[in-house]
């Protein structure tokens, strides 16, 4: 893929690495739905694992960038905005339409974004001035 910048390559690798445990977790959801407490705890745990992994991986790329979770106020200046499991309700009910989403904000504008659905292995990404693409 010649259209990938080195920065986008790092972001894609970080998101895919953070997503790696989600396929196993997703396959367990249906089995756990009969036990409401353990099921809810499991979903919260899966979300937390992805959140921590994203913070670790994105911190390696740009250690000076704060990380905001989608729906919370963004810090001033440049930052990553993440949705560790976008479509959490779908994930929680065993519906494979969920994703990990990451946006890069610089100078008040989105300069790069990734949406990755680990259940279908579909990845969409965009970078300012370079276009938007679907991997594969």
Which role fits each region the language model picked out?
Residues 1-85:
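N-terminal subdomain of lithium-sensitive/metallo-dependent phosphomonoesterases centered on the IMPase/IPPase/PAP
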Residues 74-133:
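DPxDG-like acidic metal-binding loop motif
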């Amino acid at each position: 893929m010649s259209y990938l910048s080195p920065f986008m390559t790092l972001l894609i690798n970080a998101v895919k690495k953070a997503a790696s445990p989600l396929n196993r977790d997703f396959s367990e959801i249906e089995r756990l739905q009969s036990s409401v407490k353990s099921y809810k705890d499991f979903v919260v745990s899966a979300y937390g694992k992805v959140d921590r992994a994203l913070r670790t991986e994105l911190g390696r790329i740009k250690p000076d960038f704060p990380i905001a979770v989608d729906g919370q106020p963004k810090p001033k200046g440049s930052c990553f905005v993440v949705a560790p499991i976008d479509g959490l309700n779908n994930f929680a009910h065993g519906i494979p339409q969920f994703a990990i989403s990451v946006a890069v904000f610089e100078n008040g504008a989105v300069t790069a974004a990734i949406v990755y659905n680990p259940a279908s292995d579909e990845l969409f990404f965009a970078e300012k001035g370079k276009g938007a693409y679907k991997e594969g």
